[in-house]
Amino acid sequence: MKLLRIGEKNYEKPAILSKDGKIIDISSCIKDFNPDNLNFETISKLQSIDLSSLPELSSSERIGSCITNPGKFIAIGLNFSDHAAETGSKPPSEPIVFMKATSCINGPNDDIEITKDSKKLDWEVELGIVIGKHAKHISEKQSQDHILGYCLVNDVSEREWQIEKKGQWVKGKSHDTFGPIGPYLVTKDEISNANSLNMSCLLYTSDAADEQLS
């Protein structure tokens, strides 16, 4: 399934993109795609819904972030070898783990607010992984059973604040609007091999980034 949220900011409705491309309002079945509902039980429930009995939403309406109020927004730095080369860095031997504030989450097509005195605003297309159940101290193989689905994430950064001003990365990563997510949360069953996906980030009409995961 492709899940999305449609409507004005803070008033989005949860929806499903049907196989024939219609955006179906499922707000009568689920309140929102928030931590209370981002689980495998909810996905199973949604898969059994008769979409033909539910109202259609206009495709011209604003698309919000495909999830809202996640408990954590964890990211990995220098995750692509091409990006590491662009920055003059070697791929790290251990993952660089950092946090983005959940308050920076934004719709995929919403404006990005340029911070005051910003000189080095930057963007990175990333694959977001949505976790569907709690886990601690599990193996890499076991981790696959906890993935609910995938989404696109734009990891927006102010590089001067992030790197040149020293300290933790969060200050250059978490300004309001620095976390566009979506448009869709695609359930894991729809993607047989996430490593084969291609992702693109468009800046105006130019390809700002084009990455393959493998």
Stretches with model-predicted labels:
Residues 17, 130, 210-211:
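Short stretches within intrinsically disordered, low-complexity N-terminal or propeptide regions
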Residues 70-206:
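Glycine-enriched loop-and-adjacent helix/strand subsegments that border the catalytic/binding cleft
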Residues 204, 208-214:
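Single conserved hydrophobic/aromatic residue that forms the stacking wall/gate
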Residues 1-95, 192:
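N-terminal non-catalytic cap/leader segment that marks the start of a structured domain
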